[in-house]
Amino acid sequence: MANVLRFLELVNHPDGMNIGMRHISLSTCGVVPGIDALAEQQLQLTLSVSLHAPDSETRSRIMPVNRAYDVELLFDACHRYFEKTGRRISFEYAMIDGVNDNDWQADLIAKKLRGMPGHVNLIPLNDV
């Protein structure tokens, strides 16, 4: 996290790239301690979370990080992040046919994100 924060400081600094924090999006696969540490910084950047599944079983198959930081812990961290920063979160969701694009999963996402302003970016995956 120290390197990420140093990088953000450098690109934001007037003698660096002078990019405003509101123009920066920081993506994470869902490392909960990193999200909590970032919340403490109160930066005005956009946090983007690679969600890809709202349930632990599916997310563990798609994203091995879920075995270390379960999706329930991730949702809790995102709620804490919003409470601490007041910044909405962008949730990235690659839709995989028959894996994570079911109605019940959409309903579960809505339930888990209720009360937390955010944006769900649905990314349809195409057959190659």
Briefly describe each language-model feature range.
Residues 1-128:
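Conserved AdoMet/S-adenosylmethionine-binding subsite of the radical SAM
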